[in-house]
Amino acid sequence: MKVALGIEYDGSNYFGWQRQAEVVSVQQTLEEALSKVTNTTIEVFCAGRTDSGVHGTGQVVHFDTEVERPLASWCFGTNAHLANDIAVKWAVKVAEDFHARFSATARRYRYIIFNSKLRTAILPKGVAHYHYPLDAQKMHQAGQYLLGEQDFSSFRAAKCQSHTPWRNIHHLNVVRQGNYVIVDIQANAFVHHMVRNIVGSLLEVGQGRQPIEWIKWLLEQKNRQLAAPTTKAEGLYLVNVEYPSRFGIPKTALGPLFLAD
């Protein structure tokens, strides 16, 4: 039997998603909880491997098991063995050809910026604090140069293991809600650090250091060294993963928190 789970987590206390020796990861913690529920060893496969400090409201995983449990037990039972910063949101049985990563058709991220001279005391680990004023409208306009299928070498980490820098961005929206600036981006997939590298360069436009057209120029150069530094991990959330409807993966609120879909 193959089961898919929707996972939400605060990545602040974890060294990323992927299981690693000698450090605590989200994958390891979830697998240990599921193994307690089944009394067997469980290995999970995820839709997107988030980095250290990155959060998830819409992560999807799957695992294979011969243990039968009511769907509610996969949620409540697993959550009983998890700390408060990881939670199972839903569980469904899926077809044998489903794969959390390879069946996905799109991933969606949101980057949350607290834009104020002074820091916030409310949920400070869930946002990236930038004290200089940002023009969200200019950031949005600049982001439109990145839409479509393009070579994202300028926004790709040096140690990225992907065979190709080509990705297809479906939408990139930047909006302001009070002191918060939200960058919402969806693509078929992302190269390593792509979202945080894009946001870093959009921040240069937002604070007036670079013109809107600079993003177009960066894309054309295909040179990571010309773009801005990678932004902080704590503002980034994996909020949704899209799959073909035949798999029956539930649709839930994207979040985080108050943000509308």
UniProtKB/Swiss-Prot annotation:
Q: Return one GO MF term.
A: tRNA pseudouridine(38-40) synthase activity
**Which sites are catalytic?**
D51
Question: Which reaction is the catalytic activity of this chain?
Answer: uridine(38/39/40) in tRNA = pseudouridine(38/39/40) in tRNA
The protein's UniProt keywords, in alphabetical order, are:
Isomerase, tRNA processing
Q: Which InterPro entries match?
A: PsdUridine_synth_cat_dom_sf (IPR020103), PsdUridine_synth_TruA (IPR001406), PsdUridine_synth_TruA_a/b_dom (IPR020097), PsdUridine_synth_TruA_C (IPR020095), TruA/RsuA/RluB/E/F_N (IPR020094)
One Pfam entry name? PseudoU_synth_1
The residues the entry assigns to the signal sequence are none
Q: EC number(s) per UniProt?
A: 5.4.99.12
Q: One of this protein's GO BP terms?
A: tRNA pseudouridine synthesis
Its top-level enzyme class, in one word, is isomerase
Disulfide-bond pairs as recorded: none
Q: Which residues bind substrate?
A: Y109
The family classification in the record reads: Belongs to the tRNA pseudouridine synthase TruA family.
Q: Which PANTHER family match?
A: PSEUDOURIDYLATE SYNTHASE, TRNA PSEUDOURIDINE SYNTHASE-LIKE 1
Q: How does it assemble?
A: Homodimer.
Q: What does this protein do?
A: Formation of pseudouridine at positions 38, 39 and 40 in the anticodon stem and loop of transfer RNAs.
**Protein's name according to its UniProt entry:** tRNA pseudouridine synthase A
